From Swiss-Prot:
Changing P430S: In strain: 639A. Changing V232A: In strain: 399A. Component of the male-specific lethal (MSL) histone acetyltransferase complex, a multiprotein complex essential for elevating transcription of the single X chromosome in the male (X chromosome dosage compensation). The MSL complex specifically associates with the single X chromosome in males and mediates formation of H4K16ac, promoting a two-fold activation of X chromosome. Acts as a histone reader that specifically recognizes and binds histone H3 trimethylated at 'Lys-36' (H3K36me3) and histone H4 monomethylated at 'Lys-20' (H4K20me1). Its main location: nucleus. It comes from Drosophila melanogaster. Residues 149-169 have a biased composition (Basic and acidic residues). Gene3D superfamilies: 2.30.30.140, MRG domain. It comes from the Eukaryota. Residues 98-175 are annotated as: Disordered. This is Protein male-specific lethal-3. Changing A184T: In strain: 399A, 774A, 852A, 859A, Congo13, Congo194 and Congo346.
Length: 512
């Protein structure tokens, strides 16, 4: 006869678990869930047992329910593999078509569409190697991507199709190798229900993956620490991104609008384009401010390795925070110490500050003075270099430089106002985004799908937001100098000779 005993609790409040589908009439699959509470009960024999109130992440609270431990599994890699196998067996919908975008509002017609597309093989891709970040639980656990598998056994090669209508900007395409990273909690979904966690997926390029792995190795393998405050802090990166996007949008307006055949239609078109640019720039300001708030809220719990925490917390004293704020407010040129400060005319020759003539363009500098000109030059130089050209090609007829100096006075005035914009005012209290730099910001961007999936943001707003996040990630990728070894300081945790030897080995791929 089996001896009756008190049950011991197997899971604790707040723990991430895998829960079997409670409805036995449906496919037997595992859902990523969270233990909201643990209740101690007594059975008819007076023996203790436990029930666990489970929230299926991404589902409405009305789906929360109490279950016994028999339907729960620990969140381990082995059980994640079981979750994927059960999903395969149940023939669940596999997602993975979107770059940093996936919404459950796809029309049913698209889901049912068959024909050739139903027999096209989706390439097997490897999820971004953030297993170091997750499996060791030194950063907040983020499940590995699991849904990027072949849909059948056909041998055809799937053509990659860019998402339509997402307004993605040029500059980060043409990469031969890209990996998918699904930060959604569940990597698969049933046709008749798509959990909130599956709304967003992120495509991570090899360039970004390389930077992330380099950052991880410097911290966890070589015992380095990020120099604080960062040479270019997060608030500065965000400000410069908005200014950069404003210049690119302004130039595109001029190039498109000049094709109109008559003056009246051209003016009407340009007026509409001006309104679009201004509203887009205003939205970008809100986007980066939202990212900054996310960073301030999550940096301690989600964006630091274990090896960093003591160093960071020792640095973030009130005095150091105040000093970072003072430095940023007193020296605005601190935002881009590597930027060119010499003004260049359209003919490639230096322009004397204070001059009102740039290659015959009267009044160009008078709009904003030398500071406007310097900021414009930095943005234009980025456009030229990001397009793969060298600086000598910056003065060709089709160059962005030429278009920038032909902008109407109204748009140049708007750019001047944008260049003066600050994400945080001089009166703002010290923030952590004034201290940390691009590596920690990239960690946030990798986690953003998880945060947004858990947010109540509507799908329509997500569709508007995701192209801007995609452009921001591309902007970070194009500034490798924010991630190089000059941004790290030595640690005494390892012998110096060991650090130097390991550093040389790790820099073979990144230093180029």
């Amino acid at each position: 006869m089996t001896e009756l005993r008190d049950e011991t609790p197997l899971f604790h409040k707040g723990e991430i678990v895998l829960c079997y589908e409670p409805d036995k009439s449906k496919a037997r699959v595992l859902y990523t869930s969270k233990v909201l509470n643990v209740f101690e009960r007594r059975n008819e024999h007076g023996l203790r047992f436990y029930e666990y109130k489970i929230h299926f992440q991404g589902w409405r609270p009305s789906y929360d329910r109490c279950v016994r431990a028999t339907v729960l599994l620990k969140d381990t890699e082995e059980n994640r593999q079981l979750q994927r196998e059960l999903a395969e067996a149940a023939k669940l919908q596999i997602r993975g078509d979107y770059s940093y975008k996936g919404t459950p509002d796809k029309p049913s017609a698209k889901k049912k569409r068959g024909g050739k597309a139903a027999h096209v093989e989706e390439p097997i891709v490897v999820p971004m190697d953030t297993g170091h970040l997750e499996a060791e639980h030194e950063m907040a656990p983020t499940p590995r991507a699991a849904g990027n598998r072949t849909r059948d056994n056909s041998g055809g090669k799937r053509k990659e199709k860019p998402p339509s209508g997402d307004g993605r900007l040029k500059g980060n395409r043409g990469r031969q190798t890209e990996t998918f990273y699904n930060n959604a909690i569940n990597d698969v979904s049933v046709y008749n229900h798509v959990p909130q966690e599956d709304r967003i997926m992120m495509r991570v390029s090899e360039r970004l993956r390389e930077l992330i792995e380099y950052d991880r190795n410097m911290i966890k393998v070589l015992g380095k620490q990020h120099a604080l405050p960062a040479r270019v802090p997060i608030v500065t990166i965000m400000e410069n991104f908005v200014k950069q996007q404003a210049v690119e949008l302004a130039i595109s307006i001029k190039q498109d609008s000049s094709r109109a055949r008559n003056t009246q239609s051209r003016n009407a078109r340009m007026e509409r384009e001006y309104d679009r640019v201004m509203s887009t720039v205003c939205m970008l300001k809100e986007v980066v401010d939202g990212l900054r708030i996310y960073f301030e809220f999550h940096v301690d719990d989600h964006l630091l390795y274990t090896e960093e925490k003591e160093y960071v917390h020792n640095y973030l004293t009130d005095d150091n925070m105040r000093n970072c704020s003072l430095i940023l407010n007193k020296s605005y040129e601190y935002i881009n110490p590597s930027g060119d400060t010499e003004l260049i005319g359209l003919d490639g020759t230096p322009v004397v500050e204070g001059s009102g003539d740039t290659n015959g363009q009267i009044g160009v500098i008078n709009i904003g003075g030398p500071e406007y000109e310097k900021q414009l030059q930095k943005c234009l130089l980025y456009i030229v270099t990001a397009s793969g050209k060298n600086t000598a090609q910056a003065y060709e007829r089709t160059s962005p430089y030429t278009a920038a100096y032909k902008l109407p006075v109204e748009m140049r005035g708007f750019l001047n106002e944008t260049f003066k914009w600050r994400l945080l005012s001089a009166e703002s209290p010290p923030e952590k985004s004034m201290v940390f730099g691009a590596p920690h910001l990239v960690r946030l961007m990798i986690k953003m799908p998880m945060f947004l999936n858990a947010s109540p943001i509507s799908n329509k707003k997500l569709e508007d937001l995701l192209p801007h996040l995609d452009a921001f990630i591309n902007y970070l990728e194009n500034h490798r100098e924010w991630f190089d070894r000059e941004n790290f300081v030595n640690s005494t945790a390892l012998p110096q000779e060991d650090l130097q030897r390991e550093l040389l080995d790790s820099l073979d791929g990144i230093a180029a």
